[in-house]
Amino acid sequence: MEPAEDSLGATIQPPELVRVPRGRSLRILLGLRGALSPDVRREAAALVALAGPVFLAQLMIFLISIVSSIFCGHLGKVELDAVTLAVSVVNVTGISVGTGLASACDTLMSQSFGGKNLKRVGVILQRGILILLLCCFPCWAIFLNTERLLLLLRQDPDVARLAQVYVMICIPALPAAFLFQLQTRYLQSQGIIMPQVIVGIAANVVNVGMNAFLLYALDLGVVGSAWANTTSQFFLSALLFLYVWWKRIHIHTWGGWTRECFQEWSSYTRLAIPSMFMVCIEWWTFEIGTFLAGLVNVTELGAQAVIYELASVAYMVPFGFGVAASVRVGNALGAGNADQARCSCTTVLLCAGVCALLVGILLAALKDVVAYIFTNDKDIISLVSQVMPIFAPFHLFDALAGTCGGVLRGTGKQKIGAVLNTIGYYGFGFPIGVSLMFAAKLGIIGLWAGLIVCVSFQAFSYLIYILRTNWSRVAEQAQVRAGLKSTKELIPTPADLPILEREVMDGVILPDIIRPESQTGQLVVEENSQCAVPTVGEVLTGRQLVFYRGMALTVSVAVLIAGIVVRVFNDRG
């Protein structure tokens, strides 16, 4: 390139060009162009607008249990240990189950709303209410025997007895907590998040006030804190219901209670059960890890408790992006827009990855001081600082895995997530962590090293699966779930046949497959309509509905009765 002259006659030297291989240069330019395209920027803004309030709402819910621990911690060590164990029991055997089962709505509601089959969203909510209320009975059976379970785990008898008192008071709170989970999904599928934040703030104000009044004014101790927690759960559910009713958010999606809510339970549970395992496997692993840390020594337990709290708070950011992913991807697929779903998926992974990287760097930089938020014990602080360099990369992989899980929920592929979670945690990571913890005598440092194996396996497996996703095919399946297309309209290619066979387990019913619960059903589908609520799959007759739903109720109640019998037997023994 020859030198040129400007308007004043000065010589302008051409800039030096950096020689880059043509293929590599093209890839870099295309990557930058894609990352900075208007579509990606708009999508990132939409995702952040969803993820931010979800983070705040989740933080508000998390604070309710933390407040109970803080108040009871001032009563004494036994009271603090009892409340900590009681909250763990409620979370592991109750809240985690409801959270997982309600996650089926992330798929069904978001896809139906995206496909403009609005009344179907309300029917799915009704279906979820009935199924989750039935699931309360088995959870209550475990609640009734909390003391016995804790004694089997070699916990202090006084702590176990007091924990049983706390859990018993929380029994009526479980249906309220489940209903709140469903209400949250109902609003999230429509892109409505802020009401949960407002309600969460109000519930925390009520919780703090009731804890102070019941513990100090009435001197009720742990019992008072339990009642404050239970009241807060009812307050959350009731206030959110009143908000929906007052703002008339339900007008277009709620057609009143209908017999349709008794149909399609198989489709719901095919998504709900894998969703439950996606949530519970990880949740249970951390709770078990905390228990194992207590078997080493008190310092290890204290450090594990601190890191667990930090992990819970840090995970709320990718959790928010996971919810945003399930909503945006589900809405796009329900509308049949495969390109938008792909864009949402790519953008949310970039956003979550950047945020997780920043959080990981921050925690690593603050590794020597972050534990002072929770304790002044020098030994615990020192151990936490040793684990933080391991936790930082753990959080990055965990964030990617959690966000990918949101994408899988949006696409209706929870079964894949459940299988990969099981393999990652119980096939590889957790056994390695326990071996390093005890055999290698590394304590919780070894445990978290094993957990990195879990989440890295999850993250890479999820990413590979998502990269291989046929978005056009998934969009067609989403429209079947949304009641907009018949499965007969899906024209398979020979390569699709193995996939189609698996879709029966993912909630998409093929016309040539007969459900075990119906012999004479017919496929009913109506085209895109805001009023019609088609039943996807076979329609059960009235007699079949009474039999199968009656059996579900009978089994649930029988489990509760068995729990009562075990409790009575143990009390007499």
Curated annotation (Swiss-Prot):
Segments on the Cytoplasmic side according to the record's topology features: 1-46, 103-122, 183-196, 247-266, 326-345, 401-415, 465-545
Family per similarity comment: Belongs to the multi antimicrobial extrusion (MATE) (TC 2.A.66.1) family.
Originating organism: Mus musculus (Mouse)
Protein name: Multidrug and toxin extrusion protein 2
One annotated GO molecular function: polyspecific organic cation:proton antiporter activity
Extracellular side: 68-81, 144-161, 218-225, 287-304, 367-379, 437-443, 567-573
Keyword check for Transport: yes
Main location: membrane
InterPro entries named among the record's database cross-references: MATE_euk, MATE_fam
Pfam families the UniProt entry points to: MatE
Compartment(s) where it occurs, according to its Swiss-Prot or TrEMBL record: Cell membrane
Tissue specificity annotation: Expressed in testis; especially in testicular Leydig cells.
Assigned GO CC terms: plasma membrane
Database matches in NCBIfam families: matE
CDD domains attached to this UniProt entry: MATE_eukaryotic
